[in-house]
């Protein structure tokens, strides 16, 4: 098995009733630390994520490994952070390693209650030291042909971000035209140029913008001003999008998570 994808036993989806709704959560984990790296809170984050009962969890800035942190912080997990968060609740997980450094590496991850039958990490790094990727997973959801999930964490630089959004658009154009697609994560798009670059059409929408008329404010977590995190859907409908802005969420990362019910 690919070491950067995981699966624990699951019942055959062919025997399961058709799934029409998926609970989706996206959260920038800030590598398991509070804002400004003041405190290691991965165990508390796991409990909060579990409490949402999400079917699919999109994670950004999650550590695959970090030797120095493992030696320094009591309670550091013996597994990768995404495996620790998945625990026994999400049977399948996939990881896209983006940034690699002497002590370890981090990237995006997807946790799923349904089988991940295929995944790939598309390198969308432009130039310089900043490494970015799009983690594309194909899910085997009962009653559906296939559901595509793309976990996103884009550049801090506007020029890089625009090129990465164009690559995301090309990825979307390569997928089956009628397939349900969920795109979620940290777009770092504080200028709100993403919709124009993606070329939103009737079959592609951003959940918060459709329901509330504007994108969600998610950063910084304690006093959210910037609209950085998004949930886009194609060939699926959104219902009840929420910003998880209360405690404990406001104290578990520098970003606030987003939760959306996706109707297939």
Regions found by a protein language model. Name each.
Residues 102-103, 127-131, 158-160, 249-252:
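Solvent-exposed loop/turn segments connecting transmembrane beta-strands
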Residues 24-29, 48-73, 111, 137, ...:
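Active-site beta-strand/loop signature of hydrolases that rely on acidic residues for catalysis
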Residues 90-124:
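Catalytic-core segment of enzymes that process non-peptidic bonds
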């Amino acid at each position: 098995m690919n070491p950067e994808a995981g699966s624990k036993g699951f019942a055959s989806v062919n025997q399961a009733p058709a799934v029409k709704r998926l609970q989706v959560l996206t959260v920038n984990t800030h590598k398991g630390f509070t804002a400004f790296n003041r405190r290691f809170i991965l165990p508390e984050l796991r409990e909060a994520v579990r409490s949402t009962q999400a079917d699919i969890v999109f994670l950004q800035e999650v550590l695959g490994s970090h030797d120095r942190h493992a030696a320094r912080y009591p309670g550091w997990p013996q597994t990768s952070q995404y495996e620790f968060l998945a625990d026994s609740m999400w049977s399948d997980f996939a990881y896209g390693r983006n940034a690699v450094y002497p002590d370890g590496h981090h990237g995006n991850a997807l946790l799923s209650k349904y089988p991940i039958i295929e995944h790939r990490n598309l390198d969308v790094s432009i130039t310089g030291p900043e490494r970015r990727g799009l983690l594309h997973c194909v899910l085997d959801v009962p009653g559906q042909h296939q559901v595509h999930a793309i976990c996103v964490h884009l550049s801090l630089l506007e020029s890089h971000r625009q090129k990465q959004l164009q690559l995301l658009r090309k990825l979307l154009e390569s997928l089956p035209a009628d397939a349900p697609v969920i795109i979620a994560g940290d777009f770092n798009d504080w200028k709100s140029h993403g919709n124009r670059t993606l070329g939103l059409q009737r079959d592609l929408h951003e959940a918060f913008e459709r329901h509330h008329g504007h994108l969600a404010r998610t950063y910084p977590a304690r006093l959210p001003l910037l609209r950085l995190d998004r949930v886009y859907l194609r060939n699926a409908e959104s219902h009840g999008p929420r910003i998880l802005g209360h405690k404990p969420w406001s104290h578990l990362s520098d970003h606030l998570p987003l939760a959306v019910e996706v109707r297939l």
